Amino acid sequence: MSITNSREFTINVGKIAEAEKWLSEGADLWKEITGKDAVIYKEGWGDQYKMLFVTTYESMGETEEVGDKVMADKRIVDWIQNGMTNGDLISGAVDRFFTTIKDTRE
């Protein structure tokens, strides 16, 4: 049974292209540090957008291990700081965890 984590970012008006670049850089950094794939989705219209940063884990324990690993890496901390404060790219982030019940791709 896998766990999917979705972090939903609310993108500030006029910052869509910058946020796409920032999240793409973060996904590459995430993969380098953790070995885990990340998928980025965009939802919205006009100037109102949300972007999802999605990663799948084998268990809740793995989510905690990976979280500890990335937060211990200064590059991730700097990346978060750049997007949230310095870059003013997002106005909020919400984490959600989903347990897979069935996946026909398996």
What do the PLM-derived regions correspond to, one by one?
Residues 105-106:
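Short acidic DE-rich linear segments
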Residues 21-40, 44, 56-94:
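An amphipathic, aromatic/His-enriched active-site/gating alpha helix that lines ligand/cofactor pockets
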Residues 10-21:
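Short, surface-exposed ligand-recognition loops at beta-strand->loop->(often short) alpha-helix junctions
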Residues 10, 99-101:
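Preference for well-ordered, secondary-structure-rich cores of eukaryotic proteins
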Residues 46-49:
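Short acidic/glycine-enriched loop/turn segments that link adjacent beta-strands
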Residues 44, 101-102:
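Short, flexible active-site-adjacent loop segments at beta-strand->alpha-helix junctions, enriched
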Residues 3-9, 52:
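Active-site-flanking beta-strand signature of metal-NTP-handling nucleotidyl enzymes
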